[in-house]
Amino acid sequence: MTRRFVTWGIPALLALSGGALVAQQSDEALFMTGAEPVSPEDYAKLPKQGRFRAYLPKQVDLSNAYPPPGSQGPQPNCVAWATTYAARTFLNFRDKNVQPDEPSEQMSPAYVYNRLRPAGTPCTGTISIVQALTLLKNEGTVSLAEFPDDMTKCAVPAAEGLKEKAGNFRLLDWRAVDREVKDDWRTPIILDDVKGALARGAPVIFAMPAPADFKAFRGDGVYRRAEKPDKANYHAMAIVGYDEDRQALRIMNSWGPIWGDKGYAWVDYATFKLLTGEAYSLEAPIASVAPGAPPPPPRSDAQVFADQVAAMPCGAVSVQGKSVTGFSGDLNAIAALREAATKADPAMTVAVRHMPWPQCEAALTLAAPLARAGTSLVTLTADGKDRGGDPVMMQENDIFGVSATTSAARPYLSIIYLQADGSAVELHRGHPEPDRKGVRRVTIGLSQTAQRYQVAPPFGPEMIIALSSAKPLFGDDEVVNGTERQFLTRLRAKLVSQQDDALSAAYVRLQTTR
């Protein structure tokens, strides 16, 4: 497919020909915004996306199914570019292996912007994301080839028949992302819910103020800001991925490739939470297969097996000769891998353990610390003997204890319990002193007068994690307790901030029953 030629208009051409200094001097005039923010009261009433409580990969990048970053030019129609050109086009191509780079493949932001502008109004009016999403759900849109973007005109009526064609590209649904304290506009958008939507392949649109330093941003670095700007217009953009190692979201703008990193940018998680006023996830109807479309090319049994290994959800699989080992959080994926291995080579042996989420994500996140010596963890019977097994089997009313050891190199110890009710509870945080033999050990849960642990409902798979660090992993006032999703996200952020060898870990898996 050929690349779409983007018309930039006079200001952008001058910036391109005049070099970086001219671009920097004219950023304010060159980069238009145009998002009409929704009021906190109205945002609270919008339908909300459900809380995400599942596996999050370390990285997600959906940009290959998005069109190339375009330019909204001098019109304040960023909302249409984000919702329609970016997100609605993506929904047409997320299951394909080509990038939509032709006008006939790209959804028209001009159609949406013009449909929402009253006839005869000037090209200075803004629209809200909710208005655009409502139009896309009720009416749809058409391609850029059918309704080209003319930056000199607005409130242009659609040609006869286009509205009927637009119905082919409706949204199935959209949902607002809730805030950390439900419907409290003073608290941030829930970042894990944004990442969760991206992880399941849903596009996310958001709006934030676009201050001067954001307009001047260039390169592959991470945009950061410590405080809200005093005054800046709201700007809508698409989120195309995230990277836990960078602790940043990947966004696609509508200011052309001369901005940011060829039209994209990384935005720091904390900055996103500080600035973002609203965010939405989108979904489209399942596209029907075009009549006469050729079937996908056949794959060999070896290719199918290799693909199953590479795509193992919430897991890690290793193939050594004819031995396949590892773990995954998905029983169906393990069964499919076993079947594919048998077809590829009947002599293969598959020993892939099932570790349901959140256990599988904890094991993936802590892969490097788990490989380092210095931390041990066991569960104990009521009389202090080691409980064996993987997982350790325990029944209702069983008394149990937890014993962990650490080392002089990493003397700070935290013990976290991921429980069957979906919560993460910090059982211990401290700095154990060495005993007479030099062993730094903590034993908890078996006291007759203080903490005493007893198995109680709800029952199911659980996990206890010991984390040993050279310096305190969590701050004195930092609360670790929360959901397992919140803990795993916090843990990833902590690992990014630690030196490579500063952390060691161990875990014990539990299975509690009635």
Predicted regions and their residues:
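Structured alpha-helical subdomains that flank or immediately precede key functional sites
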Residues: Q24-P76, A80-V98, T124-L144
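Predominantly the structural core of cysteine protease catalytic domains
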Residues: L56, T84, R88, L116-M252, ...
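Bacterial N-terminal signal peptides that target proteins for export
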Residues: M1-I10
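Second-shell loop/turn segments in exported
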Residues: N64-N77, R115-G125, E180-D184, D193, ...
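Secretory-pathway glycoprotein ectodomains that are cysteine- and/or Ser/Thr/Pro-rich
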Residues: A293-R514
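Stable alpha-helical elements in mature extracytoplasmic
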Residues: P74-Q75, V79-A87, S108, V112, ...
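Bacterial N-terminal signal peptides
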Residues: G9-S17
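Active-site-surrounding "flap" and adjacent substrate/cofactor-binding loops of secreted or lumenal enzymes
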Residues: A86-A119
